[in-house]
Amino acid sequence: MAAFRLTGDTSIDRAVAPPDSRGRSTHLRVSARARFLEDLDSAIARDPAVDSRLEMALTSPGLHAIWVHRVSHRLWSMPGGRLPARLLSQLTRALTGVEIHPGAQIGRRFFIDHGMGVVIGETAEVGDDVLMYHGVTLGGRSMEHVKRHPTVGNNVTIGAGARVLGPVHIGDRVQIGANSVVVKDIPAGAVATGIPATVRFPDRGEDPYEAMFRDPALWI
């Protein structure tokens, strides 16, 4: 199976639409639509079982969860918005099986394949182009009101059932194997598998994406 690498088109962030008939800028509306389509197209690129935007938009619980999270996260930062944000995230949890705390910071082109059983805590930070499978937990190891959840870099893949716990840092291009338990920092470009997770690096000259696909246990 060929590995797929996503590259962001940052032009949509610079696009500013002309004012509408009342002289109001439509930048926010266009930006939201562009982000919606970006999420949709990146999901299609990662899921060979889906053939169209319509099918993906209607049938992917992972996409539904991240779309609603983008709304609840904005509410979370507004005065008086925290309770509505929590209620919205709990409704999404009931409908999709994906629990993303509205305080979590999620980057662009994030995709949860299959969806069910994913938990992402309040202080988690997730970078761009992250792929996550079902049953993943980005959890805390403290009851204090501090940074207590993981920080995940860009272009990271986290396999089904993996647990990443505490304020650990997961570097860019890391691949975390299915059912692994990560409680320490993982350096960029590494592959982490096992309980507790041990770290290895792809062979010299080997693309880390190809290394991931060499062992199906890393991503199923």
List the model feature ranges, each with a label.
Residues 190, 194-211:
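Conserved beta-strand-loop-alpha-helix hinge in the C-terminal portion
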Residues 1-96, 206-220:
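Terminal amphipathic alpha-helical/low-complexity segments used for targeting or macromolecular assembly
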Residues 17-18, 149, 186, 201, ...:
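Intrinsic-disorder/low-complexity coil detector
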Residues 96, 102, 107-108, 113-122, ...:
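Left-handed beta-helix
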Residues 145-149, 206:
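Conserved phosphate- and dinucleotide-binding cores of soluble alpha/beta proteins
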Residues 54, 62, 67-70, 104, ...:
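Solvent-exposed, flexible loop/coil residues
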